[in-house]
Amino acid sequence: TVGMMPNEMLDNLKGMISKRQIDRLWVVGSNNDTAPIIDASFRRLLGILEKHFTSTPYLISNRPSSSDFAMYGQLSQLVNFDPTPREICHEVSLRTVAWVGLIEDQSGIEVDDEQWGSIDTLPSTVKELLAEIGKGYVPAQLANAKALENGDKEWQTEIDGCLWKQKSFPYQAKCLKLSLIHISEPTRPLY
Protein backbone atom coordinates (compact mmCIF):
# COMPACT_ATOMS: atom_id res chain seq x y z
CA THR A 1 0.00 0.00 0.00
CA VAL A 2 1.00 3.63 -0.38
CA GLY A 3 1.35 4.01 3.40
CA MET A 4 4.05 1.35 3.52
CA MET A 5 6.13 2.75 0.63
CA PRO A 6 9.60 4.02 1.39
CA ASN A 7 9.62 7.84 1.61
CA GLU A 8 11.75 8.25 -1.51
CA MET A 9 9.35 6.14 -3.58
CA LEU A 10 6.35 7.99 -2.16
CA ASP A 11 7.94 11.38 -2.95
CA ASN A 12 8.63 10.24 -6.54
CA LEU A 13 5.05 9.04 -6.93
CA LYS A 14 3.71 12.30 -5.49
CA GLY A 15 5.85 14.32 -7.91
CA MET A 16 4.80 12.21 -10.89
CA ILE A 17 1.08 12.49 -10.09
CA SER A 18 1.32 16.23 -9.37
CA LYS A 19 3.16 16.89 -12.64
CA ARG A 20 0.64 14.84 -14.61
CA GLN A 21 -2.32 16.72 -13.10
CA ILE A 22 -0.74 20.16 -13.48
CA ASP A 23 0.28 19.43 -17.09
CA ARG A 24 -3.37 18.61 -17.88
CA LEU A 25 -4.88 21.82 -16.50
CA TRP A 26 -5.22 23.08 -20.09
CA VAL A 27 -7.85 20.38 -20.67
CA VAL A 28 -10.31 22.20 -18.42
CA GLY A 29 -9.11 25.67 -19.39
CA SER A 30 -7.70 26.33 -15.95
CA ASN A 31 -5.19 29.19 -15.96
CA ASN A 32 -4.63 32.57 -14.31
CA ASP A 33 -7.06 34.30 -16.69
CA THR A 34 -9.91 31.83 -16.18
CA ALA A 35 -9.40 31.23 -12.44
CA PRO A 36 -11.79 34.03 -11.34
CA ILE A 37 -14.51 32.72 -13.71
CA ILE A 38 -14.09 29.17 -12.41
CA ASP A 39 -14.07 30.31 -8.78
CA ALA A 40 -17.20 32.45 -9.16
CA SER A 41 -19.09 29.67 -10.95
CA PHE A 42 -18.03 27.09 -8.36
CA ARG A 43 -19.24 29.30 -5.53
CA ARG A 44 -22.56 29.91 -7.30
CA LEU A 45 -22.94 26.16 -7.90
CA LEU A 46 -22.33 25.47 -4.21
CA GLY A 47 -24.83 28.17 -3.24
CA ILE A 48 -27.47 26.57 -5.45
CA LEU A 49 -26.71 23.12 -4.03
CA GLU A 50 -26.87 24.45 -0.46
CA LYS A 51 -30.37 25.76 -1.16
CA HIS A 52 -31.34 22.61 -3.09
CA PHE A 53 -30.37 20.16 -0.36
CA THR A 54 -32.63 21.92 2.15
CA SER A 55 -35.65 20.40 0.39
CA THR A 56 -34.49 17.18 -1.29
CA PRO A 57 -31.80 14.59 -0.60
CA TYR A 58 -30.85 14.04 -4.25
CA LEU A 59 -30.44 16.13 -7.38
CA ILE A 60 -33.63 15.43 -9.34
CA SER A 61 -35.87 13.23 -7.22
CA ASN A 62 -36.26 11.42 -3.91
CA ARG A 63 -33.90 8.68 -4.99
CA PRO A 64 -30.40 8.75 -6.45
CA SER A 65 -30.07 8.95 -10.22
CA SER A 66 -27.20 8.98 -12.68
CA SER A 67 -27.04 12.77 -12.20
CA ASP A 68 -26.17 12.24 -8.53
CA PHE A 69 -23.38 9.81 -9.32
CA ALA A 70 -22.00 12.05 -12.09
CA MET A 71 -21.96 15.09 -9.79
CA TYR A 72 -20.57 12.98 -6.95
CA GLY A 73 -17.64 11.93 -9.15
CA GLN A 74 -16.57 15.54 -9.51
CA LEU A 75 -17.50 16.87 -6.08
CA SER A 76 -15.99 13.97 -4.12
CA GLN A 77 -12.55 15.03 -5.32
CA LEU A 78 -13.17 18.69 -4.54
CA VAL A 79 -14.71 18.04 -1.12
CA ASN A 80 -12.36 15.30 0.04
CA PHE A 81 -8.93 15.71 -1.52
CA ASP A 82 -8.06 19.10 -3.00
CA PRO A 83 -7.47 21.53 -0.11
CA THR A 84 -8.50 24.76 -1.89
CA PRO A 85 -11.96 23.69 -3.10
CA ARG A 86 -12.45 21.68 0.09
CA GLU A 87 -12.12 24.90 2.09
CA ILE A 88 -14.55 26.68 -0.25
CA CYS A 89 -17.07 23.81 0.05
CA HIS A 90 -16.96 23.93 3.84
CA GLU A 91 -17.33 27.71 3.76
CA VAL A 92 -20.18 27.92 1.22
CA SER A 93 -22.15 24.67 1.46
CA LEU A 94 -21.91 22.22 4.33
CA ARG A 95 -24.99 20.49 2.90
CA THR A 96 -22.98 19.67 -0.23
CA VAL A 97 -20.20 18.25 1.93
CA ALA A 98 -22.78 16.09 3.73
CA TRP A 99 -24.38 15.06 0.42
CA VAL A 100 -21.00 13.81 -0.86
CA GLY A 101 -20.81 11.63 2.25
CA LEU A 102 -24.36 10.39 1.65
CA ILE A 103 -23.73 9.46 -1.98
CA GLU A 104 -20.48 7.69 -1.05
CA ASP A 105 -22.46 4.62 0.01
CA GLN A 106 -25.97 4.01 -1.27
CA SER A 107 -25.79 0.24 -0.78
CA GLY A 108 -28.58 0.05 1.79
CA ILE A 109 -31.11 2.29 0.09
CA GLU A 110 -34.38 0.77 -1.00
CA VAL A 111 -35.79 2.42 -4.10
CA ASP A 112 -38.94 2.12 -6.12
CA ASP A 113 -40.37 3.90 -9.14
CA GLU A 114 -42.74 5.91 -6.91
CA GLN A 115 -39.72 7.92 -5.77
CA TRP A 116 -39.15 9.38 -9.22
CA GLY A 117 -40.58 12.84 -9.49
CA SER A 118 -41.92 14.43 -12.64
CA ILE A 119 -40.71 17.47 -14.49
CA ASP A 120 -43.60 19.35 -12.86
CA THR A 121 -42.38 18.51 -9.36
CA LEU A 122 -38.71 19.41 -9.84
CA PRO A 123 -37.53 21.96 -7.28
CA SER A 124 -36.78 25.40 -8.76
CA THR A 125 -33.17 24.86 -7.75
CA VAL A 126 -32.82 22.25 -10.52
CA LYS A 127 -33.52 25.00 -13.05
CA GLU A 128 -30.99 27.23 -11.29
CA LEU A 129 -28.44 24.42 -11.39
CA LEU A 130 -29.00 23.81 -15.11
CA ALA A 131 -28.81 27.56 -15.80
CA GLU A 132 -25.47 27.78 -14.00
CA ILE A 133 -24.09 24.82 -15.90
CA GLY A 134 -25.41 26.24 -19.16
CA LYS A 135 -23.87 29.64 -18.52
CA GLY A 136 -20.33 28.30 -18.76
CA TYR A 137 -20.37 24.80 -20.14
CA VAL A 138 -22.51 25.37 -23.24
CA PRO A 139 -20.56 28.33 -24.69
CA ALA A 140 -17.29 26.48 -24.03
CA GLN A 141 -18.49 23.31 -25.73
CA LEU A 142 -19.83 25.16 -28.76
CA ALA A 143 -16.66 27.25 -29.20
CA ASN A 144 -14.45 24.17 -28.80
CA ALA A 145 -16.44 22.19 -31.38
CA LYS A 146 -16.33 25.07 -33.86
CA ALA A 147 -12.57 25.46 -33.39
CA LEU A 148 -12.00 21.77 -34.05
CA GLU A 149 -14.27 21.90 -37.08
CA ASN A 150 -12.17 24.80 -38.41
CA GLY A 151 -8.88 23.08 -37.53
CA ASP A 152 -8.01 25.69 -34.88
CA LYS A 153 -5.71 24.60 -32.06
CA GLU A 154 -7.19 27.16 -29.66
CA TRP A 155 -10.52 28.92 -29.20
CA GLN A 156 -11.98 31.77 -27.25
CA THR A 157 -15.46 32.81 -26.23
CA GLU A 158 -17.21 34.93 -23.64
CA ILE A 159 -18.21 33.12 -20.46
CA ASP A 160 -19.90 34.95 -17.62
CA GLY A 161 -19.01 38.29 -19.18
CA CYS A 162 -15.29 37.46 -19.41
CA LEU A 163 -12.99 36.26 -22.17
CA TRP A 164 -12.21 32.53 -21.94
CA LYS A 165 -9.32 31.10 -23.98
CA GLN A 166 -8.42 27.45 -24.15
CA LYS A 167 -6.73 24.84 -26.33
CA SER A 168 -9.11 22.78 -28.45
CA PHE A 169 -9.91 19.37 -27.01
CA PRO A 170 -11.41 16.60 -29.20
CA TYR A 171 -12.95 14.66 -26.30
CA GLN A 172 -15.14 17.62 -25.35
CA ALA A 173 -16.40 17.85 -28.94
CA LYS A 174 -17.28 14.16 -28.79
CA CYS A 175 -19.24 14.78 -25.57
CA LEU A 176 -21.16 17.64 -27.21
CA LYS A 177 -21.97 15.48 -30.23
CA LEU A 178 -23.29 12.66 -28.03
CA SER A 179 -25.32 15.12 -25.94
CA LEU A 180 -26.95 16.57 -29.04
CA ILE A 181 -27.78 13.08 -30.31
CA HIS A 182 -29.33 12.19 -26.96
CA ILE A 183 -31.38 15.38 -26.87
CA SER A 184 -32.77 14.83 -30.36
CA GLU A 185 -33.19 11.05 -30.01
CA PRO A 186 -33.49 10.22 -26.28
CA THR A 187 -34.06 6.49 -26.83
CA ARG A 188 -31.16 5.98 -29.24
CA PRO A 189 -28.15 4.17 -27.73
CA LEU A 190 -25.11 6.45 -27.68
CA TYR A 191 -22.56 3.70 -28.34
What are these regions (language model features)?
Residues T1-S41:
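Internal, well-ordered alpha/beta segment that forms a basic, Gly-enriched binding/recognition surface
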Residues V28-D33, S55-I60, D82-I88:
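Inter-helical turn/loop segments and adjacent helix faces that build the functional surface
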Residues R43-R44, G73:
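A conserved active-site cap/scaffold subdomain adjacent to cofactor or substrate pockets
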Residues Y72-K165:
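Active-site/pore-lining binding-face segments in mid-to-C-terminal subdomains
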